[in-house]
Swiss-Prot record:
One of its GO terms (biological process) is virion attachment to host cell pilus. The maturation protein is required for the typical attachment of the phage to the side of the bacterial F-pili. Binds to sequences located toward each end of the genome, hence circularizing it. The RNA genome-maturation protein A complex is released from the capsid upon host receptor binding. Maturation protein A enters the cell along with the viral RNA. It comes from Escherichia phage MS2. This is Maturation protein A. During internalization, MP is proteolytically cleaved into two fragments allowing translation and replication to start.
């Protein structure tokens, strides 16, 4: 908001007015003019309802208009008074009450409504919904941390699956690379299972990390009513030309109008209970010498199930939202010559506006939305694809 004064203020301007008679006499009628230069209608605010989990947003409006005389101009006329001819030069002597300047801008008289261009309104509504449907929204701390853990789980799973696949195919140099081990290592065993067992100091810590990330995800308990937020702001500059009836004047307005839409919603899908029924064995507790080489496939299956659950689309329920319109700008007013006068220099004034109005939106901008899971990152999907393709039997 532009920092206009919140108090009503008067301003003062000097209006020159000098009459010169043909006989050389000069008559100075210059004067000072006071006018209301600032207008701030009362703020409108209301308190939103509260629940234990949520404080609903409330409508709010405020605004300010100011007007400043830039130049009273120079106008002249010829005439006579009691038979004495004269030439007179004067400023216009106009004053604009700031309360009457709202017509220079696309706003209502009390500044609680701003006329937003339809293209801006449509774009803001469409793009905020795109953020929801594409999963591009504020996740909240708990979900953001869980997303980071899911990313770690996927990365480590990819490494393990690729190492397992390379070993199964006899490509031991590549398997060593995936396990971050020395590629020149010499193996004692000639059998695949034996060589894989020799590499347990590479894949066993990796499996332990996978287990840790997996268990961390299954232990996360999100609130049932966890608000998430999507925001989009769109603005444009507009120009307006027009006429005032009093004083007779042209005006040129330039202003910026923006619309900001905020949507609060929550994911209402049961999958965010984190598939707690799934289990995964601690790799440190397994006697690997006693299990078949292919056990790694069975061990990774719950990880695949979790990744599949995390990446599935989830439903959303609308909580509340706000639509905030803001206008800032100015208008230059150029005053015509009064009847019987000619213009040497037009009188000008400048009006400025700064206003905002926030309304509450109780429904989706369009019909309901589905979101892409916040865990649907590329490498998460890669890990899921690897488990499905390379470990299938």
């Amino acid at each position: 908001m532009r920092a206009f004064s919140t108090l009503d203020r008067e301003n003062e301007t000097f209006v020159p007015s000098v009459r010169v008679y043909a006989d050389g006499e000069t008559e100075d009628n210059s004067f000072s003019l006071k006018y209301r230069s600032n207008w701030t209608p009362g703020r409108f605010n209301s308190t939103g309802a509260k629940t234990k989990q949520w404080h609903y947003p409330s409508p709010y409006s405020r605004g300010a208009l100011s007007v400043t005389s830039i130049d009273q101009g120079a106008y002249k006329r010829s005439g006579s008074s009691w038979g004495r001819p004269y030439e007179e030069k004067a400023g216009f002597g106009f004053s604009l009450d700031a309360r009457s300047c709202y017509s220079l801008f696309p706003v209502s008289q009390n500044l609680t409504y701003i006329e937003v261009p339809q293209n801006v309104a449509n774009r803001a509504s469409t793009e905020v919904l795109q953020k929801v449907t594409q999963g591009n929204f504020n996740l909240g701390v708990a979900l953001a941390e869980a997303r980071s853990t899911a990313s770690q789980l996927a990365t480590q799973t990819i490494a393990l699956v690729k190492a397992y696949t390379a070993a199964r195919r006899g490509n031991w140099r590549q398997a060593l690379r995936y396990l971050a081990l020395n590629e020149d290592r010499k193996f004692r065993s000639k059998h695949v299972a034996g060589r894989w067992l020799e590499l347990q100091f590479g894949w066993l810590p990796l499996m332990s990390d996978i287990q840790g990330a997996y268990e961390m995800l299954t232990k996360v308990h999100l609130q049932e009513f966890l608000p998430m937020r999507a925001v989009r702001q769109v603005g444009t500059n507009i120009k307006l030309d027009g006429r005032l009836s009093y004083p007779a004047a042209n005006f040129q307005t330039t202003c910026n109008i923006s619309r900001r839409i905020v949507i609060w919603f929550y994911i209402n899908d049961a999958r965010l209970a984190w598939l707690s029924s799934l289990g995964i064995l601690n790799p440190l507790g397994i006697v690997w010498e006693k299990v078949p080489f292919s056990f790694v496939v069975d061990w990774l299956l719950p990880v695949g199930n979790m990744l599949e659950g995390l990446t599935a689309p989830v439903g959303c329920s609308y909580m509340s939202g706000t639509v905030t319109d803001v206008i800032t700008g100015e208008s230059i007013i150029s005053v015509d010559a009064p009847y019987g006068w000619t213009v040497e220099r037009q009188g000008t004034a400048k009006a400025q506006i700064s206003a905002m109005h926030r309304g509450v939106q109780s429904v989706w901008p369009t019909t309901g939305a589905y979101v892409k899971s916040p865990f649907s990152m590329v490498h998460t999907l890669d890990a899921l694809a690897l488990i499905r393709q390379r470990l299938s039997r």
